[in-house]
Swiss-Prot record:
It comes from the Eukaryota. It comes from Homo sapiens (Human). The lineage of its organism: Eukaryota, Metazoa, Chordata, Craniata, Vertebrata. The modification Phosphoserine is found at residues 395, 484, 651, 785, 807. GO terms for molecular function: DNA-binding transcription factor activity; DNA-binding transcription factor activity, RNA polymerase II-specific; DNA-binding transcription repressor activity, RNA polymerase II-specific; RNA polymerase II cis-regulatory region sequence-specific DNA binding; sequence-specific DNA binding; sequence-specific double-stranded DNA binding; transcription cis-regulatory region binding; zinc ion binding. PANTHER family: IP01015P-RELATED. The modification Phosphothreonine is found at residue 888. PROSITE patterns: ZINC_FINGER_C2H2_1 (PS00028), ZINC_FINGER_C2H2_2 (PS50157). This is Zinc finger protein 281.
Length: 895
């Protein structure tokens, strides 16, 4: 069979089908005669017995044909006499039922005997089973070789008359491919019979005159009929041995018999022996193509050629917008996206776009770790994987081998994603456990919604943020649960170095019940920001080493749940056995508290630099990290309670920190503030602090926070009413050091070292007293009968609206100042013992948020009951605009 160079020279039909032995003169398949004549003109020295094929053609896959072609249609067996007929005398179209004899030794002559609309797909398999022993062996070998490299085109060209009516081999290729993809059913044999014979006669009529006659005679003499029949007999079993391929084309294509070449090492199947040989090189380690300039070897020649360009510094592909050049065209196209800004690759999880596939794949590894189960593992093998398959194909070059590689890559990516889906599931459970900590919450049920369906929704919407706890269920309680931002001080570490989400509950072992109070606005999970997490984490690291527990002042807050005041942990708990609960009613805030997660897009670099700067400074700040040089505390209290407790003998040896340390901390706080404001797009000026005002008792200044707000609630009862008269900032972050009041028996910073807990000398208290005397007395008490004569007499106080707390708590916290005197250092823990929490949980303290003209928010707490003693609120406010003094006469302002 001659695959004429007419294919190479652009002839209409290149291969001869049934009449291949005639040299194309009587080519029954596809107008090969004319093209063969052109081949003779183009290559006069090319031997007639050899097959010319194009080595540049891609490696060809052989396709199986449906079993409907098992029986050779008689129309395809073209006789040699018809093929050898003189070109000037084209044979008349034979009768449809006439059986032609096949050319004897042409390896491709057997193909037309089985050729149907799917016949060319069988070409390679049939060739493998033919082993001619005559002089035609060389020629059939050429056919064999040709079908390895160009079988797709040759087979299509051979059968082009059946599809294209003799209009050319390329047309046949197109139709074959369309049939291959559309799985068109086989056309009736009679129809093919007519088409084949009529097209062959037409092609002979057109092009037969151009082919020399003697070639056909020579070929005819070389092909005896018996051998031809033997070959046909040999091929029948192969054709009939594939009845399993009956059915639609898809089943035939996917059939394993389509890949008859099996690897002995790994049992991989391949369509051709060429592919198998190339594959075996991987097992043997043989690299037949060695680089002449280095020791690298390659299993394919094109890889070597591409590698040699590195040595020759040849970069044929240049960017038209800059001077960069590239070895591969794909690299140039990928580079051009940097100029155009095109980002064609999209992450299905977080909807980010990327210009390069490697960046997308790298992102998917990190994105998959943060995304929760609801976003990725719900359908681990669906859209993400199909998209990745397409993505991998897009990212590679145009060669078929690279596409095969990308198939395996995409499969590997799918496996990885399935694994990450599983790991995400385990990480979610870890998230839940870590953020629940050791909370004993018998009252929290599915309605509480810690681990409810709302979590999945939150996680789908906030993929890059840490796991937010919240519930989107609408329950009876319209409350916000503001979380303590530093739960890790208790001793647990949260995931990825961050504290828990904004609704994580910081509870202690003694806490028996904490009602998860929910907000109807469904925005609980978004009060936090990454900036807060960084602050919390950095402060957590300071206190964790010396964290201790004080079970003497644990409080059961179960009775707080029944009240209408909202349990809000707006501050940081540095207690082990107390639950930080501050009370704010959220019914007036639901409409105003905005979700903050979309504003918390602080880059990881900023957070890392914050932590790095903090860790660098922490060594030099161990002595007193939060001392303030010039504390200014204005106490607005009523006249009855204007006296400040001076009985507590603070250690006079503790001095304020040096100016350099204060300036260093001031610089750090400004740096954090700038980063925070930049990250939140200046949407609010309030940083983390509430300016809390407790009215009816003396206040104790603790100079622990430089450039920060200092909040010490007086030993009053901090039950909070439901009157919230102004708007919270649009997104209120968690304070790094929060207000600890209301439910706390007392604040002790036991996590601080003794050097950390030393207070400033008594002159600071004198400043407090002076500032208190200069302020107006307040008449804004809800209970007029509350009078504090001194802190030692607070056990005798009466409250008209409060519920009495168990007397043992009161007794345990009376007159402990005497125990503090012998101490060389003053600890806040002792302060808690001295002025323990004698509060009435039923009382209400209305919280008022006043926004001045500068957009700064002042928070005023009106205490209605005066039975709470010794409770301190400390809150570190990073945002400097919040340091304006409250102008109301009923408040205690802290700057």
């Amino acid at each position: 069979m001659k695959i004429g160079s007419g294919f190479l020279s652009g002839g209409g039909g290149t291969g001869s089908s049934g009449g291949s032995g005639s040299g194309g003169g009587g080519s029954g398949g596809g107008g090969g005669g004319g093209s063969s004549g052109r081949r003779a003109e183009m290559e006069p020295t090319f031997p007639q017995g050899m097959v010319m094929f194009n080595h540049r053609l891609p490696p060809v896959t052989s396709f199986t044909r449906p079993a409907g072609s098992a029986a050779p249609p008689p129309q395809c067996v073209l006789s040699s006499s018809t093929s050898a007929a003189p070109a000037a005398e084209p044979p008349p179209p034979p009768a449809p039922d006439m059986t032609f004899k096949k050319e004897p030794a042409a390896s491709a002559a057997a193909f037309p005997s089985q050729r149907t609309s799917w016949g060319f797909l069988q070409s390679l398999v049939s060739i493998k089973q033919e082993k001619p022993a005559d002089p035609e062996e060389q020629q059939s070998h050429h056919h064999h070789h040709h079908h390895h490299y160009g079988g797709l085109f040759a087979g299509a060209e051979e059968r082009s008359p059946g599809l294209g009516g003799g209009e050319g081999g390329s047309h046949g290729v197109i139709q074959d491919l369309s049939i291959l993809h559309q799985h068109v059913q086989q056309q009736p044999a009679q129809h093919h019979r007519d088409v084949l014979l009529s097209s062959s006669s037409r092609t002979d009529d057109h092009h037969g005159t151009e082919e020399p006659k003697q070639d056909t005679n020579v070929k005819k003499a070389k092909r005896p009929k018996p051998e031809s029949q033997g070959i046909k007999a040999k091929r029948k079993p192969s054709a009939s041995s594939k009845p399993s391929l009956v059915g639609d084309g898809e089943g035939a294509i996917l059939s394993p018999s389509q890949k008859p070449h099996i690897c002995d090492h790994c049992s991989a199947a391949f369509r051709s022996s060429y592919h198998l040989r190339r594959h075996v090189l991987i097992h043997t380690g043989e690299r037949p193509f060695q680089c002449s300039q280095c020791s690298m070897g390659f299993i394919q020649k094109y890889l070597l050629q591409r590698h040699e360009k590195i040595h020759s510094r040849e970069k044929p592909f240049g960017c038209d917008q800059c001077s960069m050049k590239f070895i591969q065209k794909y690299h140039m196209e990928r580079h051009k996206r940097t100029h155009s800004g095109e980002k064609p690759y999209k992450c299905d999880t977080c909807q980010q776009y990327f210009s390069r596939t490697d960046r997308l794949l790298k992102h998917r590894r990190t994105c998959g770790e943060v995304i929760v189960k609801g976003a990725t593992s719900a359908e681990p093998g669906s859209s993400n994987h199909t998209n990745m398959g397409n993505l991998a194909v897009l990212s590679q070059g145009n060669t078929s081998s690279s596409r095969r590689k990308t198939k395996s890559k995409s499969i590997a990516i799918e496996n990885k994603e399935q694994k990450t889906g599983k790991t995400n599931e385990s990480q979610i459970s870890n998230n839940i456990n870590m953020q629940s900590y050791s909370v004993e919450m018998p009252t929290v049920s599915s309605s509480g919604g810690i681990i409810g369906t709302g979590i999945d929704e939150l996680q789908k919407r906030v993929p890059k943020l840490i796991f937010k706890k919240g519930s989107r269920k609408n329950t009876d309680k319209n409350y916000l649960n503001f979380v303590s931002p530093l739960p890790d001080i208790v001793g647990q570490k949260s995931l990825s170095g961050k504290p828990s989400g904004s609704l994580g509950i910081v509870s202690n072992n003694s806490v028996e019940t904490i009602g998860l109070l929910q907000s109807t606005s469904g925005k609980q999970g978004q009060i936090s920001s990454n900036y807060d997490d960084a602050m919390q984490f950095s402060k957590k690291r300071r206190y964790l080493p010396t964290a201790s527990s004080n079970s003497a002042f644990s409080i059961n807050v179960g009775h707080m749940v029944s009240q209408q005041s909202v349990i809000q942990s707006a501050g940081v708990s540095v207690l082990d056995n107390e639950a930080p609960l501050s009370l704010i009613d959220s019914s007036a805030l639901n409409a105003e508290i905005k979700s903050c997660h979309d504003k918390s897009g602080i880059p990881d670099e900023v957070l890392q630099s914050i932590l790095d700067q903090y860790s660098n400074k922490s060594e030099s700040q161990k002595e007193d990290p939060f001392n303030i040089a010039e504390p200014r505390v204005d106490l607005h209290t009523s006249g009855e309670h204007s006296e400040l407790v001076q009985e507590e003998n603070l250690s006079p040896g503790t001095q304020t920190p040096s100016n350099d340390k204060a300036s260093m901390l001031q610089e750090y706080s400004k740096y954090l503030q700038q980063a925070f404001e930049k990250s939140t797009n200046a949407s609010f000026t309030l940083g983390h602090g509430f300016q809390f005002v407790s009215l009816s008792s003396p206040l104790h200044n603790h100079t622990l926070f430089p450039e920060k707000q200092i909040y010490t609630t007086s030993p009053l009862e901090c039950g909070f009413g439901q009157s919230v008269t102004s708007v919270l900032p649009s997104s209120l972050p968690k304070p790094p050091f929060g207000m600890l009041f209301g439910s706390q028996p007392g604040l002790y910073l036991s996590a601080l070292d003794a050097t950390h807990q030393q207070l400033t000398p008594s002159q600071e208290l004198d400043d407090l007293i002076d500032s208190q005397k200069n302020l107006e007395t307040s008449s804004a008490f809800q209970s007029s009968s509350q009078k504090l004569t001194s802190q030692k007499e607070q056990k005798n106080l009466e409250s008209s609206t409060g519920f009495q707390i168990p007397s043992q708590e009161l007794a345990s916290q009376i007159d402990p100042q005497k125990d503090i005197e012998p101490r060389t250092t003053y600890q806040i823990e002792n302060f808690a013992q001295a002025f323990g929490s004698q509060f009435k949980s039923g009382s209400r303290v209305p919280m008022t948020f006043i926004t001045n003209s500068n957009g700064e928010v002042d928070h005023r707490v009106r205490t209605s009951v005066s039975d709470f003693s010794g409770y301190t609120n400390m809150m570190s406010d990073v945002s400097e605009p919040c340091s304006t003094r409250v102008k109301t006469p009923t408040s205690q302002s802290y700057r």
